[in-house]
Amino acid sequence: LGKLNELSDTQMMRELRLALLDPTAPTPSVEAILHALIPHRYVDHTHTDAVVTLSNSEGGAARLAELFGNEVLILPYTMPGFVLAKQVAEATADTDWTKLRGIVLLNHGLFTFAEDAKDSYNAMIELVTRAEDFIAGQVDDSATESVIPLRPFDRLAFAELRYEAGKVFGSPVLASLDTGVDSLGFAAHKAAGQLVASGPLTPDHTIHTKPFGAVFPQSPVAGLRSFCSDYSDYFGVHAHPEHRCLDLMPRFGVWIERGIVRFAPSLKRLKIVEDIVAHTIPAILTGERLGGWRPLPRTDLFDVEYWELEQAKLKSTSTAA
């Protein structure tokens, strides 16, 4: 399959399913062809916070190239699937794989590989640790410490927000408020509204969190209405005739000076949103301190959010939830 000049997403997944030895097995990853093109027995792939945070910061590509040198191939972002597999195949046509330890896909993640599973895993840990250590050396946590007052929890306003969010979604939803150090610090940030609307750690997250968060003022329902309008505009700008707009409910948002709010239609989906946001908020703050948070533009985010393969993945987890 990797030798083909072109292959549609639907055709690709059909061919991958035809190759299954067990027809009841889970559908292979959209990156299965890419994994197969890497000439090693074992491949590890993560959306490591440290590497993607560097990638999403000002001058991130240059920083990663300096950090990893010739050990790691740095490639520009390309939408996952067949096109990405072709990009990697072309970029590595003359590569000596014995000298390469990993591949960074900017704004996406890190691949490591080896003939031995432990060697591939250890390479992942070592490269991620190197990125984490680099960030620790560049960002002075003590310089930003301050006393942030915790405002009283307005239970009535929060209950009204959850109720109105359910009306937007079309059925009752769950909501939670995080007032941890990172979330409260973010909520007190002077540019919190701009940052929460800027974009995610990696575009894969958009199917769970949407491409941007909401901004909730003291009376949060007004922020919910603003998000619905903004998301409608986002869809109108990027949609094609075959697209149908998803629900307008935000999956998270910053409640100014109070914390981070998360929404979902079920407990399982809420836990997913909470987990993603718990990684996203510190990454954005770190990216800002590294020179500025620079995620992918909304055109790329829309392509993933409304990609038929990602929507199929979301539908499969929704039925399980």
What is each of the regions a protein language model found here?
Residues 1-321:
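Glycine-rich flexible loops
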